[in-house]
Swiss-Prot record:
Cofactor(s) this protein requires: pyridoxal 5'-phosphate
Enzyme Commission number(s) from the entry: 5.4.3.8
GO biological process, one term: protoporphyrinogen IX biosynthetic process
Primary location group: cytoplasm
Pathway per the UniProt entry: Porphyrin-containing compound metabolism; protoporphyrin-IX biosynthesis; 5-aminolevulinate from L-glutamyl-tRNA(Glu): step 2/2
Species lineage: Bacteria, Pseudomonadati, Pseudomonadota, Gammaproteobacteria, Pseudomonadales
GO molecular function annotation: glutamate-1-semialdehyde 2,1-aminomutase activity; pyridoxal phosphate binding; transaminase activity
Cellular location(s): Cytoplasm
Protein name: Glutamate-1-semialdehyde 2,1-aminomutase
Amino acid sequence: MSRSETLFASAQTHIPGGVNSPVRAFRSVGGTPLFLKHAEGAYVIDEDDKRYVDYVGSWGPMILGHSHPQVLDAVRRQLEHGLSYGAPTAMETEMAELVCRLVPSMEMVRMVSSGTEATMSAIRLARGYTGRDAIIKFEGCYHGHSDSLLVKAGSGALTQGVPSSAGVPADFAKHTLTLAYNDLDEVEATLKEKGEQVACIIVEPVAGNMNCVPPAPGFLEGLRRLCDAHGVVLIFDEVMTGFRVALGGAQAYYGVTPDLSTFGKIIGGGMPVGCFGGKRAIMERIAPLGPVYQAGTLSGNPLAMAAGLTTLELISRPGFHDELGAYTSRMLQGLQDRADAAGIPFVTTQVGGMFGLYFSGADDIVTFADVMASDADRFKRFFHLMLEGGVYLAPSAFEAGFTSIAHGDKELAITLDAAERAFAKLK
């Protein structure tokens, strides 16, 4: 019995499902989740001392690779001064100034402790600013686990939301309209009928929670136009894409400016953190300036600020994101070549340093339906074959993968060697 198996059995006694976030349980792929004890560079090491090339990256934050020495040094220096103060710090202001400089749409910013807090607060702010209750989100997009966002589409584009988690009252869900991602016509029709009720549209500019689905040409631009026409606040959820697909996030990559944005993951350098911000006129509605309440005991935690500031400074060097994207492209092309050689229907998607893998014969992946039509059972087999080969992919056919600047030629060779053997066994 492996150490991970022993630990997982023990964990299930006191932790629901043995994990503190559902995807970690390996329910989508089967088997026992890896229990990790160390990480360095492009690698994670499990409790049985096996090393894996890591394409999960703690679900996105580790863009520099694990245990980057300059990030660790920054955290150690802060440790000498205390863990948490519950009071303003100079680093919070420094972080706010840096974020506003890197992301010009962010005229003001509020720090929080998670991406869920950031999206929840941004939606509350949009509702307070507009005086409207309804929100629009998109099928397959995930914005954290707050009640009004755990909603799936009903039996039609204009059907009111239905809770997709037990414990979410129908009265919460009824204000959430869930539409098809990349279907601008559906958004236009919905706003034509209900626009005066809609406070905001929240969207992942690259849908990273149904694998990795880029926006169709004109989709984000169309959302901007429709929001302007109907007085709706446009929120980009950049918890995943922020500072990863480009230094200025997906809004810089695609050239579309939202009213509010949410960030997390990279902004904390691996520490628990998030933020939301945007137009000054909207942000000034937040307490203590305005009537929209938001607060947090650990918001702006100094350890998180130290790690985040150092991370953002390091990824700001010229050429960083070009290098990250180039490695990702080489890796994906290598996977595609080996799948083609084995006669396996396979397609990939990429935006910068995030990517998607699909066992599908489709020419492209554009919609939630395209994702759901891919062969999830074949992905399960591929996942475990890659794991045997020393490569750790996201343990779900519906999650994006992430590269880091620590990935290089050695990691590429390990990855493609494992993939060649895996595809051969999948024939």
